[in-house]
Amino acid sequence: MCTSIALMGDNFCFGRTLDLGCGFGDGAVITPRNYVLKFRCGEVMRRHQGYIGMAAVVDGFALYADGMNESGVCIAALDFKGNAHYPPLPQGGRRGIAPFEVIPYILGKCESLADVRKALDEVSIVDVPFSDEVPNSPLHWHIADASGSVVVESTECGMQIYENEHGVLANNPPFPFHRDNCTLYLNATNEPCGQEGVFCNGVMGHGIPGDYTSPSRFVRAAWLRKYASCEGEAGLFSLLGAVAPPRGVVTGEDGGEHFTRYTCAMSPDELCYAYKDAESGEILRTYMKKESLDGETLI
């Protein structure tokens, strides 16, 4: 369970909740420009965009859940169990990249969403695990910059890139379902009901689902993003809080509690990655501008 939101406007911000039954990540990790990226297909990036995000560092490699590069391209990987499919070999003469390589590939290579579309046209996402101990996760990806956002899904029908006018993403089902499902809520607006009464205040948005299923979180996030007068990091944290399950309300298939482990907000204008820990509620910020981005080792 996860939800991501691209909050457009003069102060573009991108963020997500990470909702799991277990923790993830060692905190914000920066990959500097001269950290050598070696992809399983054989491609090597010796110099690239610097980027930051939440990652678990395994054998000296940062396995990112989300991130932002110094050009303002942002990405989040969300669970896509049930529909994610990675072929064993690249399709259509494209180069192959592993699922765990999608984030470093995009953030290292692309300076804009236009670059993202072009880069993805050249690759297939293939079933190559990081290691025997770290298998691939079923994922799809929400990618955005100040100009808009796209969703990338690899299913048995192949890899698809969808324009995402709603600017949000949740989990399974595939994005076309979520997009079409939103049309069922076109009558829900922020306009007053036109009648006086004890129940009139707050009736705007009546019918928007409030549970924590993926379709409901997608609709709720899309509706809030459309109507809320929120901007910047604070506004994004406010929106994400409306779709973040607290501890105890969601039980996973394993019988454990699934809740929001962290919520993050990426601010390209400031090159700031901020994340809020679910346990303490404290917001921790890392500014890329304050670090040496020309290094060769992870920060």
What are these regions (language model features)?
Residues 20-22, 81-83, 157-160, 279-283:
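Short, surface-exposed beta-strand-loop junctions and turns on beta-sheet-rich folds
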Residues 18, 79, 145-147, 156, ...:
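Short, flexible loop/turn elements at secondary-structure junctions
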Residues 92, 96-97, 123-169:
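Acidic/His-rich structured neighborhood in mature extracellular/periplasmic domains
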Residues 1-13, 119, 128-131, 136-137, ...:
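C-terminus-biased signal that marks the final domain/tail of proteins
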Residues 14-19, 153-155, 275-277:
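Catalytic Cys-His active-site segments of thiol-dependent hydrolases/isopeptidases
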Residues 1-94, 127:
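A contiguous strand-loop segment
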Residues 92-129, 232-238:
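Proteins synthesized as precursors that undergo proteolytic processing into mature forms
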